[in-house]
Structure formats: structure tokens, C-alpha cells
Amino acid sequence: MDKNKSTFKLKNIGPIYYINLDGQPERKEYMEDLFKYWEIDNYERVSGYDGRDDDLSDILKGRYPEQMTSGEVGCTTSHLKAIKHWYETSDTPYAIIMEDDIDLDIVRCWNFTWSNFIAKMPYDWDVIQLAIICTGGLHVTLHKRFVNDFSTACYIINRHHAEKLIRLHVRGDKYKLDNGVKPRAVADDLIYNSGNTYAVPIFLYKVQLGSSIHPEHVDAIHKASYNALTNWWTQSGICLLYTSDAADE
């Protein structure tokens, strides 16, 4: 493996909590190797809920959410589990939540460091989405999140917003998803829509790993967004860390 000369850009990143299913050890290995390559040690694995063969009704409080697959339920509850675990076991002001298909390769193209990024975050943020799958024009400046900025592959969340999500959607060791999240209680809508959420695509996602929830989306949506962002970063490498509603493609 080649020597990574860009590790300094991610110095002081963390704490990271990455979600991984027990039934996907190959993804755990991928993440552990990724962190080692980038010299990241401030991370912890969170065992996710697997909705592929179980409807997960036993971990829900209240009605089963409408128009959601068991895979989507597993994704949402796994994120709530990770957020709750961080909130209750750490006193850090924020956490970085990752799924086990995150891709850090474009960090090589950054013209800034993680510390630079943290220093320029908006004063009023609750969540900042750091990986984006978009069905429309891509926005590469830090912007208020658009409705078609999809993906919970990676985001940073503060304690205030974590407390709100736990209060609304966690009941002991169970989860409540029937309390009016619009349009559905999928992870994107539940986490992002209930707070002041910004977005900027400074990380990617490993399309080669596919999708455990929506495999049909990989070719239809994920690859086009991935390719567009990869091309932009490799050709420009400049991320404008101020808020903007203008499209930069």
C-alpha cells in the first residue's frame, strides 16, 4: 500500500462512531483498514440493526412506521443507537457518525484541513451532512441542506440536536418512529429535518460496496453523483467553506 501523504489533513478528526452490521464483517475490515491508512484512532464501532431478514418490530415502540421497509427501519434505528451511545458515554461537543461504506479518498484533494473545517462551521448548526448523493445539481459549497441532498453515510451532529432526537425517538432500549416525521421516518428525514442542517460533500461513499437497503439505487443514482463529485474534486480541489445557495458543479 502506498504511503499516505495527506493524513495531516484529518489530524484531530473525531470522535467517529461507525455503524456496521454483525453480518457484514468484510465492511468492518474495510473500515478498520481505512482508519489505519488515514492514521485515525478516535473511532468506535456500533453494531447496527439488521432489517434484511427481520422486520425489527421487537425494537419499536408504538405503531410500525408506514411506507418503510425493514431495511430502512434498521438504518434509522442504527443511527439512533449510535447517537444515543455517543451522547450517553461521551461529553464531546459533537460526534461524527459514519456508515461502513464511507470513502475518504477525496481528502487528498482538499485545500484545507479538518481543523480548518471545524473552525468555519456556521454558528447555528445542528447537523452538517458531509457526504451527499444528489439527484439534481450538486452544490459543493457549504449550504443549507436541500431536500434532494440524500445520504447518511457521514454527518457531524452536536449534543443539542442529539438530545432532541433521543427525546423524540428513543424509549429505553426501543425506538419510536410513529410520531410524525415527514415525509417518512427514514434516517435522512428523521435526523436532518428536525434541526438546522447544512451540507457539503467533503467525503464520498464506496459505490463498489453496493447498498444493503436500496441496491437498485446504486446504478440509477449513486454512481452518477459519485462520478460528478470525484471529477469536481480532482479537477478543482477547492471547497468554499462559506454558506451559499448558488450551485457549483
Language-model segments: what does each one mean?
Residues M1-M98, I102-S244:
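An acidic/histidine-cluster motif and surrounding catalytic segment
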